[in-house]
C-alpha cells in the first residue's frame, strides 16, 4: 500500500471540497477511505492499527460533512413555491363568455447535463490499485484558483501532517480502540458493547472447584493456542468451538469466564434475548455484527449460554422462518471464525464456547461446528469439600466444623446447590439474633453482634431445607448422549 498515494488522495479530496467541487471531492474521499480500510486489514501492530482507524474516522466525518452540503444544495434546487389553496369564497365571478386566464406552467429546475470538458485530463495509467476506481478530475484547477486557495491548502496539509504524526507516534495513551460500526445501526452497536463485552472477567481456575478434566481440555483447546501460536498450525489448528454439556449449576459459565481471564481475551456473554428482535432481518444483523465485533476485539471468547434456545434442531413442525434464518446466519458465521489457520494471525483467534442443558435438542450442523464436546458432571466428594471452602472463605467458621463430613452428605448436589446451602447457613446466626426485635432495635445493632461464626448445626439445618435440583434420570440421559456424541 503506497502511503504517499493515500495522503495525495486525501489532500485532493479536501482541496476540491474547499473549491466547491463537491462531486470530485466525494469521489476522492470514498477512495481514500477504502484504501485506509485495506491498509488496516494488513497491519499486525494494534497500536498502529488504532491510529489508522482514528484517521479513517476523521476522514469519514469530513466525508459526511461534504455529503450534507451536497444534499443541502440539492434541496435548494428541488424546492418550489407552495401552492396555497383558494377557497370558493375568494374565487372571483367569471363571465361564461370570457375565456379564463391560462394555467401557469409548472417550472422545475432542469436536470444537470454533464458536458464534456476539454480541459479534463485522462487518468494516469500508473495509478495504484487502490485508486483505480477513482473518477478523474472534473475540472483542472487554474493558477488563479490555486493562488486563492493557498491558505486553505496549508491548513489541510497541516491536518494531514498531524494525522501522519499520530500514526507514527503509536498509541501512547493506552486507549482501547473503538469498533467502527459503519453500515449498522448505532444503537445496535452500543447495545452490544454495553450488554455483551466484558473485558477481564477476573475469574481464575482456582475459583472453580474440581472439574480438573474439563479445565485440562479447555486449556488445550483455548489457552495453549494463545501461548504457543507457532505450534498450533496446520492439522494442529485450534478448535473452532467447544460445547460444554451438563446439568444446571455445575459451573459451565464460570469455566467460560476463567478461559477468558487466563487468555486475556475479550469475553462476549451471549444469550437468546441478545440476538433476537421483533423486526424482520434485525436478528441476522445482530448475529453478523456480534462476530464482526469479535474479530475486531480479537483475541475473543464468545460464550453462548443456553445455545439450544438459539440453534435448536431445524426442520421441525413448530419452527418459524425467522428462527431458521437466525440459525443459518449463526452457522455461517461460526464456520468462518476458525482462528489460527495457515494465513491468519494466531493472535486474532475467535473461540466460540457454548453451554447447554439439553444437548439432544441441538442442530446437527451446529454439533459438527462445535468440535469439542465435553461433559461437566456433578462435583465429586473432594470437589464438594473444596467448593464448601471456597463458598465459606469470607465468613468465620466454628472450629468444630469438618467440611469433609458435610461434603459426604451432599452426594448428588450440584455446585449451585452447595453454594445455596452455604449462603443459607451464613444467614442463620443473623436470623437468631434479630428474632423478636423491632425495626428500631435491628437498626441499632452493631456490626460485631451480627458477625457470628457459622456452626455445624447451621450447615445441617440448611442441608435439610435445600434439596437436590438434578435427578438421577437426567444424569443418565447426559451420560448416554456423551457416549453417542461426546468428543472429549
Swiss-Prot record:
The keyword Protein biosynthesis does not apply. Keywords: Acetylation, ATP-binding, Cytoplasm, Cytoskeleton, Isomerase, Microtubule, Nucleotide-binding, Phosphoprotein. Its EC number is 5.6.1.1. Disulfide bonds: none annotated. The modification Phosphoserine is found at residue 172. Residues 142-167 have a biased composition (Basic and acidic residues). PROSITE patterns: AAA (PS00674). Residues 128-179 are annotated as: Disordered. GO terms for biological process: microtubule severing; spermatogenesis. GO terms for molecular function: ATP binding; ATP hydrolysis activity; identical protein binding; microtubule binding; microtubule severing ATPase activity. It is found in: Cytoplasm, Cytoskeleton; Cytoplasm; Cytoplasm, Cytoskeleton, Spindle pole; Cytoplasm, Cytoskeleton, Spindle. The modification N-acetylmethionine is found at residue 1. Interacts with KATNB1 and KATNBL1. Regulates microtubule dynamics in Sertoli cells, a process that is essential for spermiogenesis and male fertility. Severs microtubules in an ATP-dependent manner, promoting rapid reorganization of cellular microtubule arrays. Has microtubule-severing activity in vitro. Belongs to the AAA ATPase family. Katanin p60 subunit A1 subfamily. A-like 1 sub-subfamily. This is Katanin p60 ATPase-containing subunit A-like 1. It comes from Rattus norvegicus (Rat). The gene is Katnal1.
Amino acid at each position: 500500500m503506497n502511503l504517499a498515494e493515500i495522503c495525495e488522495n486525501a489532500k485532493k479530496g479536501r482541496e476540491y471540497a474547499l473549491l466547491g467541487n463537491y462531486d470530485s471531492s466525494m469521489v476522492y474521499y470514498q477512495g481514500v477511505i477504502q484504501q485506509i480500510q485495506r491498509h488496516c486489514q494488513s497491519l499486525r501492530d494494534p497500536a498502529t492499527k488504532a491510529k489508522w482507524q482514528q484517521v479513517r474516522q476523521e476522514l469519514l466525518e469530513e466525508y459526511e460533512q461534504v455529503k450534507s452540503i451536497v444534499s443541502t444544495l440539492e434541496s435548494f434546487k428541488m424546492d418550489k413555491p407552495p401552492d396555497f389553496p383558494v377557497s370558493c369564497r375568494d374565487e372571483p365571478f367569471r363571465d361564461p363568455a370570457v375565456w379564463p386566464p391560462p394555467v401557469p406552467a409548472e417550472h422545475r429546475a432542469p436536470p444537470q447535463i454533464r458536458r464534456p470538458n476539454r480541459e479534463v485530463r485522462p487518468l494516469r495509467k500508473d495509478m495504484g490499485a487502490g485508486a483505480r476506481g477513482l473518477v478523474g478530475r472534473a475540472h483542472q484547477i487554474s493558477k488563479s484558483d490555486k493562488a486563492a486557495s493557498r491558505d486553505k491548502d496549508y491548513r489541510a496539509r497541516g491536518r494531514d501532517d498531524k494525522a501522519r504524526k499520530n500514526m507514527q507516534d503509536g498509541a501512547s495513551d493506552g486507549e482501547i480502540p473503538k469498533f467502527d460500526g459503519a453500515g449498522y445501526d448505532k444503537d445496535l452497536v452500543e447495545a452490544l458493547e454495553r450488554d455483551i463485552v466484558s473485558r477481564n472477567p477476573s475469574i481464575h481456575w482456582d475459583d472453580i472447584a474440581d472439574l480438573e478434566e474439563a479445565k485440562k481440555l479447555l486449556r488445550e483447546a483455548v489457552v495453549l493456542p494463545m501461548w504457543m501460536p507457532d505450534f498450533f498450525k496446520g492439522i494442529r489448528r485450534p478448535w473452532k468451538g467447544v460445547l460444554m454439556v451438563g446439568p444446571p449449576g455445575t459451573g459451565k459459565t464460570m469455566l467460560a469466564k476463567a478461559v477468558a481471564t487466563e487468555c486475556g481475551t475479550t469475553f462476549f456473554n451471549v444469550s437468546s434475548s441478545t440476538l433476537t428482535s421483533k423486526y424482520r432481518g434485525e436478528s441476522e444483523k445482530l448475529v453478523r455484527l456480534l462476530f464482526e465485533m469479535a474479530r475486531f476485539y480479537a483475541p475473543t471468547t464468545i460464550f453462548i449460554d443456553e445455545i439450544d434456545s438459539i440453534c435448536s434442531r431445524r426442520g421441525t413442525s413448530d419452527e418459524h422462518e425467522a428462527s431458521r434464518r437466525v440459525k443459518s446466519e449463526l452457522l455461517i458465521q461460526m464456520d468462518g471464525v476458525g482462528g489460527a489457520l495457515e494465513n491468519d494471525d494466531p493472535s486474532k483467534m475467535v473461540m466460540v464456547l457454548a453451554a447447554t442443558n439439553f444437548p439432544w435438542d441441538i442442530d446437527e450442523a451446529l454439533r459438527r461446528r462445535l468440535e469439542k464436546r465435553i461433559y461437566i458432571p456433578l462435583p465429586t466428594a473432594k470437589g464438594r469439600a473444596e467448593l464448601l471452602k471456597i463458598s465459606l472463605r469470607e465468613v468465620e467458621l466454628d472450629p468444630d466444623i469438618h467440611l469433609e463430613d458435610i461434603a459426604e452428605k451432599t452426594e448428588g448436589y450440584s455446585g449451585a446447590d452447595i453454594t445455596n446451602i452455604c449462603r443459607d447457613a451464613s444467614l442463620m446466626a443473623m436470623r437468631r439474633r434479630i428474632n423478636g426485635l423491632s425495626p428500631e432495635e435491628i437498626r441499632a445493632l452493631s456490626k460485631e453482634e451480627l458477625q457470628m461464626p457459622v456452626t455445624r448445626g447451621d450447615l445441617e439445618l440448611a442441608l435439610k431445607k435445600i434439596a437436590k435440583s438434578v435427578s438421577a434420570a437426567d444424569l443418565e440421559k447426559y451420560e448416554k448422549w456423551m457416549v453417542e456424541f461426546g468428543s472429549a
